[in-house]
Structures are given as structure tokens and as C-alpha cells.
Amino acid sequence: MPRLSNSCLKVARCCLYFALLNGISSAQAETRALGFAGVNLSGAEFASSKKPGILNKDYTYPASSDYSYFSNAGMNTIRLPVLWERLQPNALGELDPTQMAQLQLAVARAKAWGMYLIIDIHNYGKYYGGKIGGPQTPISTFTDVWRRLAKAFNSDNAVIFGLMNEPNNISAREWAGAAQAAINAIRETRANNLILVPGALWTGAHSWDKPTNDGSSNATALTSIYDPLNRYAFEVHQYLDADSSGTRGVCGSSTVGVDRLRKFTDWLRANRKLGFLAEFGSANDPVCNDALSEMLGYIEKNVDVWMGWTWWAAGAWWNSSYAFNVYPNKDGTNKPQMAILSPLATRATRVPAAAAARVPRVQPLR
């Protein structure tokens, strides 16, 4: 389809982006755009068994061209998975300067293209294998890393804090306590960044009301989450294969995505909360493509409770045969799913981060 030149699009996006940081008008918010649409750019979390590993041998960070490609495709949000142990090699210790330099460069590259960057601690609720809240990794260890990150990116509205990727092997009640402690630690630094709060059970939308090992569910345990600035959303993941694991390319039906989001959407509305679909993916076949279009269309129709989405995944180091990989081909051509994602992202971000306007404005901290 016709496109602006790269330079014109970049200038337009940056102007709109910085206009947002100076405050979105209520008239803009009323256009009901989702606001956030993008992709997970993997690489920094690769070779997770190698701690810390060697940069650009075991793991890598996205190149500047990665941001430009997805920005030109209409996206405005990058979710950046990173390993906690690389960011903070020692519990309660300083953040690693090499990793922080890479993170700061990632933020700068995202902002240069008018994009938001989600820092995703991609650790599944553990640190060096120790469950958050357990004897090896007390909650104070978890709050420490977020306190340090909050100080580093304090009130940079381009940076979104993703507390933890897919917590598991932890009850919803235990996780709710850890998440609340992290929110408290972040706000104590006076940072007003948007926070994404996942649930237990790999934060599946389909399993939001399922009991964990102590009988509590995300639907019950997380209703009490409190942010004094009310600048947060609940992060969920939802894949379209039979068991929602994202390990297979086959989709059950064209309505499977909508069916699995429906209860969570109802929960958001009943509890006056906001949601963010931070991971989802499907293979390129007719049923999956229909399911993908239907699911993202459903989110757009329920913009009163959904803030946005980020596809899983892209990144230069993904095998080109990986079914969910939307990183461009070596010849520069697009992966098939981009024919669905790009126009939907462009429409969703027509008012940059309009969803952010539905989060109460930050009041000066006293």
C-alpha cells in the first residue's frame, strides 16, 4: 500500500510522539485509538543458561535498523526482553554498566523513531533459579532491581516497566504480594512510568480465573493491586494453539483468540482495570490468520479496557523457519503475518498512545 517516505514518516512520528509527552488533549483521547501496538524484539534474553554470557556471541540487542523497520510498518512499541541476572549479576548489587549502556541505547533508538520501549524482565518469576519470595530470592531482591531501574529511567514516558515475564510456580496470592512490593518500590523513587503487571500461571488470559496451588487465582488476588498514580495495566499473554503454550503453529478455530480473551476482558471491565496483550503469536495459515485478525479486532472494539499489544516475536537471531518470526527476510521482504499486523498497528496508533490519555494524569508528588 502507499507509504510516506522513511524520512517523512520518521519526522511525523517524532512530532506526534513529543506532542504526547507534552500532554494529549481530551479530544484526541476520544478518537478511541488503542495507542500501543508493536512487537517483541528478542535477543538480549537469549542463551539464558549462560550468565552473564558474552554480548554479541551468546546474546544481542536490537540494531537501529530494527526499530526503523517496525516503525515504518506502523508500530510504536517495542517490548525488549532482558535477563535479570545480566542486568544485576549480584542480588542487591549495582546494575551492570554494560547492560545499562545497552538499555539506554535501546531507549534512545526507540525514541528516535517515536516509539515506546517496554523493559521486560524475562525471568519467569525467578532469579538464578530461586522463586521470588522464596529463601533464595526474597521479595526485597525483586524490589531492589526495580528501584534501581526506576531511578535510571525515572519518569521517562517512553519507557514502560514490565515487572516480570510469565511468573510461574508461584501462587497468585504470592505473586500479587511481590508485584505490589515492586510497584511500591518504583513509586517511592518518584518515577511515574507506566507499569505492566502480569499474573501467575504464565499470565495467560485464558487462565486468569484458574486457581493456582493455594486456590487463589489472578482474578481474585490481583484485584487489590494499588498504584498511587494509577498508571498501570495488567499484562497477559495469549497464544492460539490447543494448549495456549505457543509451541505449535496450529490454531483451533478462527474464533479461538476472541474466545480466550473474552473472560479476561469482562474482568477488566467489571473491575475498572486496563489490559495489555504483551505476547501472542500464530503461524501463517488461513485459520490462524483469521483468528489473529479476529482477536486484534476484538481488542480494538474493546478499547475502553485494552491499551495495546506486542506480537511475539522478532529479532535478527531468530531462525527464519520459526513460525512466529516476523523479522524481515534477508532480501528485505516482509513475513506474511505483517500483512495483518502492519495495517492494524497503523490504525491502532493513529493517535500515539491515546490509551495513555485514559490513565489519570500524573500529579506532582509532594
Predicted ranges, named:
Residues Q28-T77:
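N-terminal carbohydrate-binding accessory modules
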Residues S42-A47, T77, L83-Q88, N123-Y127, ...:
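Solvent-exposed loop/turn segments at secondary-structure junctions
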Residues G38, E294-L365:
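Extended, alpha-helix-rich binding/interface surfaces that flank or overlap catalytic cores
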Residues P2-C15:
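Bacterial N-terminal signal peptides that target proteins for export
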Residues L55, Y59-T60, T143-R147, K151, ...:
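Extracellular glycoside hydrolase catalytic/binding regions
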